[in-house]
């Protein structure tokens, strides 16, 4: 998604490490990059600065499967954190969740409440993601954008109906790398 902690290396004013990289982004998420939509955080009280990207873009849709050098990537829309937030299922084995799930020591929660565009939608999307994976009998490794990874399906969705609150201190998973 377009939050600068995830796309900062391709922003037009970045040092240039990825100036030639092709950016794969969901159609809805791209509206933030074009300026059509502004990102709001802290319970919609603040707008984040506009992220400007000049790279070539490939726009993605929910359920679309792409192949990059023999690697199968399935794009799954999970709106809530942002309106166009997607997760990416790689070869049916690895699920890159970005800011969809926050792992605490006792399991996964819907990502930080204060940073969501729509908290109810975020919770609903997380439950729908679980159902989509269950329907296909998939048990991927979950790789989050901030709180590590797990291969424990039940742990990943343990608190899918609850939001991670920035005002309630929760011990992070002591076994996970932690960068938040």
What are these regions (language model features)?
Residues 72-77, 83-155:
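Metallo-beta-lactamase
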